Amino acid sequence: MRHYEIVLLVHPDQSDQVVGMVERYISQIKEADGQIHRLEDWGRRQLAYPINKIHKAHYILMNVECGQTTLDELEELFRYNDAIIRNIIIRREHAITEESLLAKSAEEKRARKAQREEAQQIQDSAEA
């Protein structure tokens, strides 16, 4: 089996259904004895250029290991799912399991925000 990196852009109106879609794709990969090495939900992000008058999309990243028939089935599902605006499948030499830069930066941003809120609470309690 080969390793692939899959990025999906989901229509922003369908963001609440992303979890169900991803679960369906994961179950299909696992049924075919494939593996999920990394799954990241990058959330709603601005597109570089509008696609069908849409300016934002919900991004999903998956690193999977599966056979060609499973990959063909996934491609067909992506093609006929109206909620998926764009997809890209890239073949990789090995499994990538570490967090992507986007996930790391989002995590760092959350940590900085938590520190600021904590500092604000300490300052507010000191003033009171």
Swiss-Prot record:
Keyword Ribonucleoprotein listed: yes
Provenance organism: Acinetobacter baylyi (strain ATCC 33305 / BD413 / ADP1)
Protein name, as recorded: Small ribosomal subunit protein bS6
Tagged with keyword Ribonucleoprotein: yes
Role played: Binds together with bS18 to 16S ribosomal RNA.
Gene Ontology cellular component terms for the protein in this record: cytosolic small ribosomal subunit
InterPro entries: Ribosomal_bS6, Ribosomal_bS6_CS, Ribosomal_bS6_sf, Ribosomal_S6_plastid/chlpt, Transl_elong_EF1B/ribsomal_bS6
Gene Ontology biological process: translation
Highest rank taxon of the organism: Bacteria
PROSITE patterns: RIBOSOMAL_S6
Record Gene3D superfamilies: 3.30.70.60
Stored NCBIfam families: S6
Protein keywords: Ribonucleoprotein, Ribosomal protein, RNA-binding, rRNA-binding
A single MF term (Gene Ontology): structural constituent of ribosome
Record-stated family: Belongs to the bacterial ribosomal protein bS6 family.
